[in-house]
């Protein structure tokens, strides 16, 4: 999770298209399942059924004063950033990799969301917490389009973007045909 959080952090702070492509390529070069999850997240193909903005507000109200959060959110203007900064870190746990964390969240039942998801948020660093909230709400807004991801993959594997686009809609997680 630390590596993916770092990737998103670098992507959002990088204005250069070519630098973003290089960052994506460096991440996708790794031969592990995390790159498949990263691709699913960056191409908006991953969603969580029970974790929405309203649920996150409910959870944060259990952790901090509602007025303090509301004032902070008004000032910051971004839900994920506000929650990641104001959420009390109880203990920073051992960093899980992206795939393990996502699989653990997918296993959470609706009745367990409040306790289990709160515990997960409490164990993450601010940057990891921000990343997880962005993933769960589906609103990354980091300056990376699906086309940019395709361009990075095409350059990485010496293919044309058209070749990637031809197979794109037929791909299924974990994207073995692509990687």
Please name every model-derived segment:
Residues 1-179:
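N-terminal nucleic-acid-engaging modules of covalent nucleotidyltransferase systems
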